[in-house]
Amino acid sequence: MRIDKNLPNYLTIARIMVIPVIILAFYINNSLARKLGALLFVLASITDFFDGYIARKYNLVTSFGKMFDPIADKLLIGCVIIMLLKKDNVDEIPCLLILAREFLVSGLREFLALVKVSVPVSRLAKVKTFLQMFALSILILGSKGSGIIYLDIVGEIILWIAAFLTIITGYSYFKACKKYF
């Protein structure tokens, strides 16, 4: 099977470009718009898996992808967290833990790249990302979009679990940098 050599990069770019549409759908604030926003977020989240999978499987890894895939993830997650904090009654603590870790780890990854140290993404970090995206999907839809009364609580519980894993997985980056402090 022939794959366009830029397909993984197109998926990464699409993930970034859908962010304003997700936010707009959320702010329209009716059930259908919430469902659309949640669906778009889920689709954008799925591209995170496929861009990396396709790039590795078909040897299409690029410098652009290495740089922008994590940026796209952080933009998607960060924008949705900020949106939820501003508009809905979402607990600030797990949101701030996730945002702080993502910014710190981004900086540490840049530093480690400068000193030629690679820290591979662990399986636990992939679980963390999945749980973040799953929780945020639920919270975008929320009780307002689904009619399911306790859906927000389920989303918050999963978000707390994701925040806990966020701290644990961030430790590997700090550990890799320790000898440079």
UniProtKB/Swiss-Prot annotation:
Superkingdom, taxonomy of origin: Bacteria
Main location group: membrane
Record-linked Pfam families: CDP-OH_P_transf
Biological process annotations from GO: phosphatidylglycerol biosynthetic process
Top-level enzyme category: transferase
MF-aspect GO terms: CDP-diacylglycerol-glycerol-3-phosphate 3-phosphatidyltransferase activity
Annotated compartments: Cell membrane
Record key words, sorted: Cell membrane, Lipid biosynthesis, Lipid metabolism, Membrane, Phospholipid biosynthesis, Phospholipid metabolism, Transferase, Transmembrane, Transmembrane helix
Catalysed conversion reaction: a CDP-1,2-diacyl-sn-glycerol + sn-glycerol 3-phosphate = a 1,2-diacyl-sn-glycero-3-phospho-(1'-sn-glycero-3'-phosphate) + CMP + H(+)
InterPro entries tied to this protein: CDP-alcohol_PTase-I (IPR050324), CDP-OH_P_trans (IPR000462), CDP-OH_PTrfase_TM_dom (IPR043130), CDP_ALCOHOL_P_TRANSF_CS (IPR048254), Phosphatidylglycerol_P_synth (IPR004570)
Transmembrane segment boundaries: 8-28, 35-55, 64-84, 148-168
Gene Ontology annotations for the cellular component aspect, listed alphabetically: plasma membrane
Membrane topology summary: Multi-pass membrane protein
This enzyme's EC code(s): 2.7.8.5
Pathway(s) this gene product operates in, as recorded in its UniProt entry: Phospholipid metabolism; phosphatidylglycerol biosynthesis; phosphatidylglycerol from CDP-diacylglycerol: step 1/2
Similarity remark: Belongs to the CDP-alcohol phosphatidyltransferase class-I family.
Purpose of the protein: This protein catalyzes the committed step to the synthesis of the acidic phospholipids.
Name of the protein described by the UniProt record: CDP-diacylglycerol--glycerol-3-phosphate 3-phosphatidyltransferase
Organism encoding this protein: Rickettsia felis (strain ATCC VR-1525 / URRWXCal2) (Rickettsia azadi)
Gene that this polypeptide is encoded by: pgsA
